[in-house]
Swiss-Prot record:
Source organism of the structure: Clostridium perfringens (strain ATCC 13124 / DSM 756 / JCM 1290 / NCIMB 6125 / NCTC 8237 / Type A)
Co-factor remark: Binds 1 dipyrromethane group covalently.
Family: Belongs to the HMBS family.
Gene Ontology molecular function: hydroxymethylbilane synthase activity
GO BP, one annotated term: protoporphyrinogen IX biosynthetic process
Protein function: Tetrapolymerization of the monopyrrole PBG into the hydroxymethylbilane pre-uroporphyrinogen in several discrete steps.
Protein name as it appears in the record: Porphobilinogen deaminase
Keywords: Porphyrin biosynthesis, Transferase
Superkingdom as given in the UniProt entry: Bacteria
Entry keyword annotation includes Transmembrane: no
Length: 291
């Protein structure tokens, strides 16, 4: 038997899927192969995500492959997955979470603190752009899209002083050496689910148990808390929303940020990790209480 796993065509998406394939072989002794799918988010690289719908643009065509029984499961970056899935699907596993931090990439090794005044920084993320302005309001934010390799090329092509990328993607691609600096995730909050992988299947799928065996309880605890936070705030690519969460013993600690009445609000919460979804909701309500 060979499981078919749908994923995007990008190098990073394929590397992430290969990691899941390795885990399937290692834990379940099951062979698998990739089904590469071109998503709307991959096709429309000329427009910023917040103008064409944001979250879900990297998921819909892949879900169609599951619906058409062309694949048994799909691997996503959790930060691309909308907080509400269509009723036919479920997230059966979140197998691993890489480094959750954002990374600063510059070709000359500059760090954020020693950049020239008015430096040009590339990012298409409102979350990154708004938090960056809190550090250095003199910086010029330049919107860029494309895969990791394309964005790095744009440093030269668009005369940028640097760009911001997720550390997880760079590490998975073996490109850690291009990182000049890391952002403290408790200060510069990551995207919801950043660094985490998710496996989506049709509900009640015949082979779902193979994928479920790869689930990490700790990863699921943190990511579900963050997604609960996002759901209350209805946040996506068009708004500043970020969260940091960590499990320590029986506790879950979370920090969240969101824009309320044009003001960036940041709050934290601590509670029992078994109440992860409730804690995410309470943190969101705490932030909305600032209205």
């Amino acid at each position: 038997m060979e499981l078919i796993i749908a994923t995007r065509k990008s190098k990073l998406a394929q590397v992430q899927t290969e990691k899941v394939m390795e885990l399937l072989k290692e834990k379940e002794n099951v062979d698998s192969k990739k089904l590469l799918v071109m998503t709307e988010g991959d096709r429309r690289l000329d427009v910023s995500l917040n103008k064409i719908g944001g979250k879900g643009l990297f998921v819909k065509e892949i879900e169609l492959a599951l619906l058409n029984k062309e694949a048994h499961g799909a691997v996503h970056s959790m930060k691309d997955v909308p907080f509400e899935l269509p009723s036919e699907f479920e997230l059966v596993a979140m197998p691993e979470r890489e480094d959750i931090r954002d990374a600063f990439v510059s070709l000359n090794g500059s760090t954020l603190s020693n950049l020239r005044k008015g430096a040009r920084i590339g990012t298409s993320s409102i979350r990154r752009a708004e938090q960056l302005k809190l550090f250095r309001d003199d910086l010029e934010i330049v919107p860029i899209r494309g895969n990791v390799q394309t964005r790095i090329k744009k440093i030269t092509e668009e005369n940028l002083d640097g760009i911001i990328l997720a550390a997880a993607g760079l590490k998975r691609l073996g490109m850690e050496d291009v990182i000049s600096d890391y952002f403290d995730p408790k200060v510069f909050l990551p995207a919801i689910g950043q660094g985490a992988l998710g496996i989506e299947c049709l509900k009640g799928g015949e082979f779902n148990d193979y994928f479920k065996a790869l689930d990490s309880k700790e990863v699921r605890t943190t990511v579900e808390a963050e997604r609960s936070f996002m759901k209350v705030l209805n946040g996506g690519c068009h708004s500043l929303i970020g969260a940091y969460s960590e499990v320590k013993d029986n506790d879950l600690y979370m920090i969240g940020t969101f824009t309320v009445n044009n003001r960036i609000v940041k709050k934290d919460i601590l509670g029992n990790k078994e109440d992860n979804i409730l804690l995410g909701k309470k943190l969101a309500e705490k932030i909305l209480g600032e209205v």
